[in-house]
Amino acid sequence: RIPSSAASDVYKRQLVIPSVAFGGLRLALLVLFGVLFWGAVDLWDSSMETLALMGLSVFLSVIVGVILGVFCGLSDRFERGMKPVLDTMQVMPAFVYLIPAMFFFGIGGAPAILATMIYSMPPIIRLTNLGIRQVPNETIETATAFGSNKLQTLFKVQVPLALPSIMMGVNQTIMMALALVVLATFIGAQGLGSEIWVAIRKLDVGWAMEGGLCVLLMAIMFDRFGKALSKEKTTLPADSQRFYLLPQNWEIY
């Protein structure tokens, strides 16, 4: 099913405009090519379903993961308790997460979101913990000396300094979520995974290739978008941002 042109244009703007704002023209062209490809191969609705499932899963995973990562970074005892849990979560096969989710929530989108959220959580917890622990003690002592309490030091000093590591964890979480969202078709989740599975059952190589390319483009887009968000923003001086039709130092020629 192909959505109406008006709705399609709205979705394209919602995807392309943030790419221009955070990643520049190159990322925007990549995202535009991706969304046009989704529509060209008649997999727009499936791509949007996968995008919605993954977006909600990543949102919940990042919220819970950052909170747990901060606790790990502030407490050695909490980190020792979480480490074997995270190690176990990362060595378990992806299909194992689908079984308890299906047992408690049945078949559909809800168990897919739960399984994806849990499966993609370890990277954001580990990298948030790493970022918090890498903040220099001198910086924390300076903030305390200027009268900051523990919460102010955490939210105004430690978390901002740990933000590059946290954003790297968000990027890894997105990649892991995309991997499991495709597999979640086995518990009734709709999206690109179901399209690929039906194509494989029918031995339709072209259809399966189209679905795989859609997943590949989605992964590349989110990887580049995550890297663009994690980069430090640098601004040019006001005079350097102006556009001049003729060179200003023409007298040297």
Report the location of each language-model feature.
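Single conserved hydrophobic/aromatic residue that forms the stacking wall/gate
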Residues: I2-A7, Y11
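Transmembrane alpha-helical segments of polytopic membrane transport and secretion proteins
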Residues: A6, R224-Y253
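Transmembrane-helix boundary motif in ABC transporter permease subunits
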Residues: I17-V20, G34-D45, S57-L86
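Membrane-spanning helices that line or support transport/gating and their immediate boundary helices
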Residues: S46-T50, V70, R80-P84, L127-Q134, ...
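Generic hydrophobic transmembrane alpha-helix motif, especially the helices
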Residues: L53-L56, L60-V64, G73, K83-S120
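Glycine-rich helix-loop "coupling/hinge" segments at transmembrane-helix boundaries
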Residues: F103, I132, A177-M218, T234-D239
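Transmembrane alpha-helices
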Residues: L114, I118, K150-L183, G206, ...
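Short cytoplasmic-facing helical segments at TM-TM junctions of multi-pass membrane proteins
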Residues: P123-G169, I196
